[in-house]
Amino acid sequence: KDLTARNGKGFNRTNLTYMRKLYLAFPKCGTLSHKLTWSHYYELLKCDNALEMQFYYKESIKECWKVRELKRQMKSCLFQRLALSTDKAGVLALANEGHQVQTPQDIIRDPFVLEFAGLPKQKRYKESDLEKALKDHMEQFLLEMGRGFAFVGRQYSMQIGSRQFKVDLVFYHCILKCYVLIDLKRAEIKHGDIGQMNLYLNYFKTEVCQPDDNPPIGIVLGTRKDELLMEYALEGITNQLFVARYQLYLPKREELQAQLDKLLDEAE
């Protein structure tokens, strides 16, 4: 009451609790970024550990996330999903430097979370339904894909010999300087899907890419994948070709955090 009387509104019990948390997390006020608002810090302080908070802090500044974008990335467990694809040193680098995009592998998340598409996970849908939903929610899809992506087209047509083929989504990655082709599968990824994407990549290298472009990247997205089958299917392929899962709902944070804790404990 005394603080409110002297300084105005905003000094309720909840805000005071978060102000204390802010001081404990950032004891040196000079380390705080003026690019972030109090609402950003309010969300950051909900993180369970310092590594996670540092990651979202760095990414919010680097990517100029609005508060709603920060909240979505936290709900989708972006930190845990990226961290589980690396080792302990990678987790620490992720927290200290944010997500660095330097190689094709850096743009892969497994799973990709597409809850914004609005397709009920139990309802049957066609691949074209998912493709259209992603195009209709392109801003959210680009947020999930990460920095550097520029949308090129949907159902990109390729004439190869006497046959015509179409790849679902095509992007250009401004950091990696290459095309990124995405093929969507409604169910489990099959070994034939790998050969099909490899065909598309070979076509792009020859017919589409410019001399100063890096080799294209292919991503086959499905709801499930057999790890051993994919290992054999990808063996011997020299193109940058990846397979990853997607899900139409937000992940369970507790499960991902438990997996990450196990990874860090095993590295001790």
Regions found by a protein language model. Give the residues of each.
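Basic, low-complexity intrinsically disordered segments
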Residues: 1-268
